[in-house]
Amino acid sequence: GAPIAGFVAATNTNRTIPDWIATGEYNARPSVETFANAMDVGAPSNYERIKAMYTLDQVREQFASYWLNNDGILDAIRSCNTKTGYIMDPHGAIGWQAWDDIRSGAMKNLMDGVKNDFEKPGLTPNIPSWGQKVVEKKAVGVLLETASPAKFGEIVTDAIGKEPPIPARLEEVMRLPDRAIPMENDYNLFKDWLLANL
């Protein structure tokens, strides 16, 4: 496998997992709407899988945790665009900002005993086993992103002052007619429809 030393659990204001990693207490809560809507989960399903496979100490060895609010998301989109010329969507911007902060001094500050105010966005107070590699500039971060910034045009425009380009494939999809099939919220009706139409 790939020589991966660890991960950054970066999210938005729905920071249930970063809070758990930092405090050891898992507190599911109602989700809060943010610019990074795919992360708007107050009770993440992956928690149960992680808890079944690893102890909290094992998770803390492998994961740094980080969160941003909407203002931070806009700043991250803007900062990435200014520093690199790349336009990110809100979800990728959270990951980018997390890694940028971690490698630019947040991990060193944490290792030196300077703790971020836990109620403010940023790196939470947990030092993973790979923290020293970051401080020594011996770590490389890899960001994986799947969403196009064009799907979040208004948010991206607010951040960088211009609309993101729309990829040709997305333009093709946007030209397709809308197709919706009104249906009651009933599993059996849905199942019957699927069986009849597939």
Task: Specify the residue positions occupied by each region the protein language model found.
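PLP-dependent amino-acid enzyme catalytic core
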Residues: 1-198
